Amino acid sequence: DQGYSRYFGDAKPGNKSANDWLGNRRMLEAFIQHESTEAARADSPPVLVFEAVGEAGRIKGQVIFHGVAVITRAELIVQREDGGRRRTFPNYVFELAPLDLSHENESLDWNWINARRNPSVAIREVLQLAPSAWKLWVESGSVGSLRRNVVTRGVVTEAMQRPNPGSIEAAILQD
């Protein structure tokens, strides 16, 4: 929420290269378009950012939509699997720049996504439905001030604010 997100590609441990995974290939293709000319950016796919969340004891199936992003970096890394054998494997990590949707009241017109899928709709017509930050990015090629930044309040519990028992600070509070 501070203007960037990271997405680890879809590679898994085994004998495949990081480039052999369909999701990684698609993200790399999108990255090339995102870093290309205005015409290529206009036709490039947006990255829709979702967060998986647990709900009512269920781990899968619930997501929160966080917005539309542009890929600003792709890096080949070595990743270690979670749990179990903890094997290492090559994968990509993609840096994403979520775009500001404040002009759209933090919502997305899904007609834009649907129009993108329709081959009979011209790219310029599709762009008319895009969020304003996406249009500006297509035009300029720079995400700079178009990044989404969410200001959050940090709420600290009372217990966390209290000094350790027996400390000088605790003695001051008792006086």
PLM regions and their residue ranges:
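An acidic- and aromatic-residue-enriched active-site/binding cleft used to recognize and process polar
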Residues: 52-54, 71-74
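Acidic-basic catalytic patches of nuclease active cores, encompassing PD-(D/E)XK
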Residues: 159-175
